[in-house]
Structure formats: structure tokens, C-alpha cells
Amino acid sequence: MIRVNNIHLSLDYDDKSVRKAVAQQLRVEEKSIKSCKIFRRSVDARKKDSIYFLTTVDAELNINEEKVCKKCGNAQIARKYEYNQMKFGNAPSPIVVGAGPAGLFAALILARSGANPILIERGRDVDRRTADVNRFWTSGQLDTTSNVQFGEGGAGTFSDGKLNSGTKDIRQRKVLEEFVSHGAPDEILYNAKPHIGTDMLKGTIKNIRNEIIELGGRVMFETKLVSMGFSDNKLKSITIETKNGNEIIETDNVILAIGHSARDTFEMLYDLKLPIEAKPFSVGARIEHLRQKVDKAQYGRFAGNKKLGSANYKLSTHLDNGRGVYTFCMCPGGKVVNASSEKNRLCTNGMSEFARNAENSNSALLVGINPDDYESDHPLAGMYLQRKLESKAFVAGGENYNAPIQRVDDFLNNRKSTHLGDVKPSIGPNYEFSNLNEILPEYVNTSMAQGIVKMGRMLHGFDDGDAVLTGVESRSSSPVRIMRKTDTLESVLIEGLYPCGEGAGYAGGIISAAVDGIKCAEKIIEKSNK
């Protein structure tokens, strides 16, 4: 198999044109190609009048492939990634806390090793969780144990289901292949910016859970970690809270994949004197535009092309005040969702289904902040800042989980909005006209305003006065890092405790969290064989 890079394909390409382009690149006859398959595909939209797909194609030839590679600088022998599944040794069943991407993939790898893991999740299974979330979005009745943050699949379940990642870890291919084998569409294997969509992601998550159970694992929903027992700096047990009361489970290995919103767990870990440090994160708001205008700005006359789909964007700028402003978790053809999980506090996120065909497109507009901006040097000071901003957003929205919104023109002029333009907010249960300048810190407001203006020069219409800001976006990443060793991935203080994933400060998104879960599982399996 040869991997051929830099193949340019038109938007209306078919299998025949792919074969022809590969033959031209390799300088061979088309009949020499037995088969070809796109390995990676991205959109090159730098020239709006000449948009094309830039692809990498895997081709199988019926002639000597090594000779062909030597004469073609854009090709090499393709090496298929094969994951080495280890077997579990003689040790008690490990426990995985949290059924987000990190926890699910950790439990899956452990189950395949024969470890019979126990996966506990404070929220509900994805079907009951979906019903709880939909009820909240329509009625404002928040369930603090089952919501956008807590439940099977983690916070990423109600998102765009993005599967791109900055990590170069070879395990990310493993994660994508697992998603496909559990029901995700094949295109996530080759799209440069793959996404599943919240509708398809739910079924995939259930299939992973079912395999864990079939392999001997145990999955416990509505089960919350409330304490841990140590002796001589070694993990000995955990205490869980269920509907039937508290229970102590003896174990010497726990993967702590709790997610970025498990604030009461952060406080419990701090009380147990586990080493935790405050880390930088970002705050801001969701910004919402008409999808057709974003598509036009990105794709010009090609807007609406079915193969292109709804347009994505990723913008960033560095300001004179030293702060960075950037867009994050862009949801083409999606909606802004109420992601609240605590009583009397409100935060937002973005979500798309697989089709990405809703009226608006949105993204987070964020300002980077660091521990120097926090109100104290407490390890949980960033978390307390999040809570403060979310409490202010709750009050600004009317104290009923309606979200505070503001037109961009009004935000730039520091005045409360009184009407909408052509962009209608998509968030539920409802919204309240507000002035986000009165919710967010002054340094965030100033930076967001400057960023909007500068980004309007990068993407036509980004600074449209009728675009809608919805507040607040405060949970793009964890505000803490639970310290761990670089070699064993165990807590720097407690042997057998593995801080893992986004909540622990070691990932940022579905793929990187899943990869971290796999790595922690591998460490436990390795230790079981010593």
C-alpha cells in the first residue's frame, strides 16, 4: 500500500477522478492501480473562486510499490497502525470514575484486557440523560446530577462531537477506528475536521458501554465518588454514594476521569490534601451568526455545496494588552445550549447534530486568563471564579435559567440590548436581553470587543452588529490540574490513583481525553503484570 500526499480533487470528484489523480501523481498507468481510498481530506478555501479538496490517498498497486515510491517524492509505503492489546495480570478489578471519553475508553481497554473494570458515573445513562436535558431546555427544570455536564458520554455528548485534536499521539487513530466500529460514520477516518454530531454520538456511546459489559465489566450509573481511603500513600478503597446509601469498595487502582465540572469532587480531593494546582483557562460568551452568511464568507460562490457542508472557521488574535482572543468549539449549523449543572448558576456551550443544518452557526469567543487573574492563590481559585461569573449570568437572565443575550453592536457600545436583528438566539429554555459587560470582568470585555473587531477583518461579517452573544462560556477547559507523575501517570502523592482526562487537566476535547484514558488503562495493565 502506498500513501500519496497532496492530491487535489474538485468538489465534484468521484472514484474515477481519484484514481486518475493518483496515477498522475505516481506517474503510472491507471491500470496499475488495484484500489485506492482517501486517507485524509481537508478543504482548501484560501481562494474563494477556486476551492478544492486537498487529500492524501492510500493506493494499492499491482506493480512494485517501492520502486514507484523512490521516483515520486509525494508518496511512501503506508504503515497501518495496529494497536497492541495487552492482557491483564493478577490484580483486583480497577475502578474508573467518570463515563466521559477518558473513562469510557479506559474502561474499554481494561475490559478487553480481561480486567473486569467497574465504571461508575454520577449521572444517568445517555437515554435518560437526554430526556433530563431536553426537559431542562424546555421547562428550565435543572437536574444537578443529570445534565449537559454529567451523565454517560460526558460533556462532549451535547456538543458538536468534534474529533479533531492537536495531539500527535498515534492512539488517536485507534480512537477514531473505535468510534467507527461502534457506529460512527466512516468519514471521520479521513476528514481533517471530523465530527459525529450529538445525535450519532449517543448511539456510539451506548455501543461502547455494551461491549464493556459483555466483556465482564460493570457499569454503575447514578453513583458518585465521595471519598477515598489511603494507607502509606497507597490507594486502598473508595467510598461511593448511590440511591441506596454509601458503600466502600476496596481497590488499589482507580482512574479518576471526572470531567471539568465535577467541582464538588475537586473540593473533596483538596480536602484529602491531594496535590492540585490552578491552571489557565478561558472565559467569554457564545457568538451566533446566520449559517448562510458564514457559509458565504468562507466559501463564496461555492456556499451550499453538499460536499462542503456548513462552513467552519477558527480565528485567533493576540492583543496589545498581552491577551489572546480566539474562537473555540465552532458549531456550523448548530445551536447554543444551556450547559448549566449547578443550582442558581448558568453557563453555555455549543452543539450540532450530524447534518449541521440549523439556521445559525456559533462558536465560543474566549479570552485566555491565567492564575494571576484569580482573586486568590488558592488551588481552586479558578473554579471559584467560574462559579462567580455563572452566578452573575443566572441573575442577569432572570434567575430562571434563561440566558443573558446581547447583540454585538450593543456589546461594543456597552448598552443593554432591547431588540434582535436578523439573528435569533437558539438557546433554551429562553433568553433575556442583557449587557454582558456587567457580567464578565472588565479585562475580558475589553479583550472580547477588540477581538470581535479584529476578527471581522479576518472573516467577513464576524463583527456583524446583529450577531448575538450569549453568556457565559466558562467551561471550555478545566480550571485545575491534579498533579501526576510523568512516567506512571499516577498521582504524585498516592500510588494507584490515576488523574485522567480533561477534568484532571491533561486533555482538551473528546479525542485527547480518550487517548489519555487509554494511556492510563495501559499503565494499570502493565503494573498488573509485574
Task: Name each region found by the language model.
Residues M1-F53, V57-F158, K162-K530:
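Residues forming the flavin
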